[in-house]
C-alpha cells in the first residue's frame, strides 16, 4: 500500500486508525517470545506532549544533571534538548527517568482533583492526536471510542474535516525544526457552496550554518539529506467530498491519487 512500511515496530504508528495500529502490534506481539504466552489487553500511544501534560499535573521532575522539567519545557527537552546536550546512547535512560518519575508521582497523588485535571487535558490531547488508546475488550473499546480516545478517519458530513498525515522518512530528529501551518479560505459559489482552498506549509527553521553544529543523530546520517526533513504526506478528503487542483511550491512532489483501507487519499513527498 501507499505507506510502504518497513518491519520496524515504530512504523506501526503510521496508520490513520488506532484499531489498525493495535491489530498490527498484536500480530507482532504474538510472534515474540515474551508475547506469545501473554495476553495483550490493548495499546496506549503517547508522545512527549502527553508526558508534559502529566508533569504539569504531577509536579516537576529533577534529572540527575540538575535539569528541572516542568509543564512548559518537558516536551522541548524530550524532542530536542536531550539530543543536543547528550549522547545518543544516553537518551533512552533520560526518557526512562522522566517516565518513572511521572508515573510514581501520579500514583502517589491520585485524587479527584488530579483525575479531573488529567481528564480535561487528555481529551484535548487525544483530539490533537498526541494520545490514542485501543482495547481488545469490545465493551471497553466502545467506551474508549465514545470518549474520543481511539483515533479514526473522520466520517462526519456535517462537520467535514480534511486529513493531513505526515511520517518522517529521513532517520533523524528533524521534526522539531519543521514548522507546519494551515490556511483555509472558503471560496464557495452558487454551484459549489462548500468549496474551500487549503494551503498546507512545511518550513524548515534550521539554519544552514547551524547544521554542522549538531550531531548526525539530529540532522540525519545521509549526506544528501543532512539537516533536511523528508516527509511522506498523505491527504485525505473530507468524508463525502473530494480534493482537486493540487499546486506545489518548493521541493515537494505533486500529490498522486492512491487508496488505503478502501479510502481514497493522495500521497506526496516533501523535503
How does the language model describe each region?
Residues 1-271:
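Non-catalytic, solvent-exposed segments at the cell envelope interface
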